[in-house]
């Protein structure tokens, strides 16, 4: 089982062509707000191997859903 990756918005650059630009990119880790919405704290997330980006303040619902699915998969494997 692979660990989830966080998606974040890319910055807008004036020199990029809009049709070549991707809206999202893989981030450094999940924000604290995303972990809290998924029912985790920082210590438990790090014990599970989830990377935490403490500098990021944004909360993306896609990342919260990814974390919830990951936790469900973990609970299914344990039982």
From Swiss-Prot:
Any coiled-coil regions, as ranges: none
Any one of the GO BP annotations: translation
Keywords: Ribonucleoprotein, Ribosomal protein
Any matching Pfam family: Ribosomal_L13e
Keyword Ribonucleoprotein: yes
InterPro entries, per the entry: Ribosomal_eL13
GO molecular function, one term: structural constituent of ribosome
GO CC aspect terms: ribonucleoprotein complex; ribosome
Protein family per UniProt: Belongs to the eukaryotic ribosomal protein eL13 family.
Protein name: Large ribosomal subunit protein eL13
Organism: Saccharolobus islandicus (strain Y.N.15.51 / Yellowstone #2)
Lineage summary: Archaea, Thermoproteota, Thermoprotei, Sulfolobales, Sulfolobaceae
Gene name, Swiss-Prot/TrEMBL: rpl13e
């Amino acid at each position: 089982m692979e660990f989830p990756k966080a998606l974040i918005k890319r910055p807008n650059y004036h020199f990029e062509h809009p049709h070549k630009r991707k809206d999202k990119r893989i981030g450094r880790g999940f924000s604290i707000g995303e972990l809290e919405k998924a029912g985790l704290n920082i210590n438990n997330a790090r014990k599970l191997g989830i990377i935490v980006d403490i500098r990021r303040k944004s909360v993306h619902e896609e990342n919260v859903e990814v974390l919830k699915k990951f936790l469900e998969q973990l609970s299914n494997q344990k039982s």
